[in-house]
Structures are given as structure tokens and as C-alpha cells.
Amino acid sequence: MAQLDTQKIISTIANSKKTTPVKVYLKGKLSELHFPKSVHAFIGKHTGTVIGDWAEIKPILKKAKLDDYYVETAGRNTGVPLLDIKAANARIEPGAIIRDQVLIGDNAVIMMGAIINIGAEIGAGTMIDMGAVLGGRAIVGKHCHIGAGTVLAGVVEPRSAKPVTIGDHVMIGANAVVLEGTTVGEGAVIAAGAVVINDVPAHTVVAGVPAKVIKQVNDQTEAKTVLLDELRKL
């Protein structure tokens, strides 16, 4: 997939057909129900399930003679579908929300509650921890750790031509914030709770609000921030 720029992401969201994806459980006389091909219909004699856009399903249900039905709604007027993750060569835990047109590298790990927006890229062997947010087009290199609750700002709103870019082998502690357009160099360490508003040089440790360089990465730093390949095995 070609890398999306800011305007392409905005245009994709603005111009996409908006849908309300639903799953509907049906009970009653179903033999006379006929749904369009765009709706996935699994119909038995007296019970069934249909999956599709509520705009297509609702008119049919209004005319049907049903004993009962129940609607599960996944979203309302959604502009970007979720990524089909079946083919991803990665560990993606339940509860992660990953939108379409996201690139996920081999052996990456995406934990529960992580939110990955359209156009983001996650390098091989990188872990996105619980509740972390990768905004639109955020780019994370190989073998990184993005801590729980961390936010990498996106390019959409406020608009930014340059995405957040995280180099390879970067460790970001919990609840850090990296603002739009910022580049974090290879091997850098960002302390928990830091707010990064400027580029971070490679192999440095930054901390604070706003984040400032407090030292160079040394043997002691590397020992404290070592990543575990065992957690990235599939």
C-alpha cells in the first residue's frame, strides 16, 4: 500500500460512502425475506442472522412479518472500515481497534485497547501497548515499544503535512505524548508522561513537560529498557 499523505486521508474520510454496520438476529417466518448481495444473510426456517448496512436492511425488516429481531450496531455513519486482520502476521489482542489502510509488520504486537488510525505504519517486532493511540499516518519503526496510554498525534486534525515518525529500537514509556510532525531518532528513550514537542536525537533519553534531553543512552539505560523477543513470537 502506498503511503497516504494528509490530504489523501482527509479526502478518503470525507468522500467515502458512510455506512451504519449492523448485525441483526431474526426470529419468525423468514422464508420470504430477500436481501441484496451486499448483505450477508444466514437464514434458517425460523431464525437467522444478517450483517450489513442498516440503510439496506431496515426497509426489508419494516415489511417483514417477524416475531422478533435484535440489532447490534457497530457504528453510525462510519467513513472508514476496520482493517481485516485475518492475514496479519502479528499478535493482535481482542479489543484493539485498527482502521483500514494500516500497515502492520511481521511479529508486531498490538495489545488490548490500542487504537490505530488510518494510514499508520507499525514496524516488525514493535509492541503497541494497552490503550496507546496512533493517530492518522503515524509511523513507528522496527522493534519499538510504545507504552500504555501513549499518544502519537495524527496528521488529520489539526492538519499536519508531516507525520509523527518513530525510529527503530525506540522505547516510549506509559502515557507519553508525541505531538504532530515530530521525529524521534533511532534508539531513543522517552520517559513516561513526557510531552514531546520537538525532534528527539537518536540514542538520547528525554523526559519532562516539555520533554528535554537529560542524558545519552548508556549501558545502564539499555539494561532497563531491553525488549523481550519472547513476547513477539507467534
Curated annotation (Swiss-Prot):
Entry's EC annotation: 2.3.1.89
A Pfam family that the UniProt record links to this protein: Hexapep
Pathway, per record: Amino-acid biosynthesis; L-lysine biosynthesis via DAP pathway; LL-2,6-diaminopimelate from (S)-tetrahydrodipicolinate (acetylase route): step 1/3
Catalytic activity from the UniProt record: (S)-2,3,4,5-tetrahydrodipicolinate + acetyl-CoA + H2O = L-2-acetamido-6-oxoheptanedioate + CoA
GO biological process, one term: diaminopimelate biosynthetic process
Keywords: Acyltransferase, Amino-acid biosynthesis, Diaminopimelate biosynthesis, Lysine biosynthesis, Repeat, Transferase
Enzyme category, top tier: transferase
GO molecular function, one term: tetrahydrodipicolinate N-acetyltransferase activity
Function: Catalyzes the transfer of an acetyl group from acetyl-CoA to tetrahydrodipicolinate.
HAMAP family: DapH
Record-stated family: Belongs to the transferase hexapeptide repeat family. DapH subfamily.
Name used for this protein in its record: 2,3,4,5-tetrahydropyridine-2,6-dicarboxylate N-acetyltransferase
Species assigned in the record: Lacticaseibacillus paracasei (strain ATCC 334 / BCRC 17002 / CCUG 31169 / CIP 107868 / KCTC 3260 / NRRL B-441) (Lactobacillus paracasei)
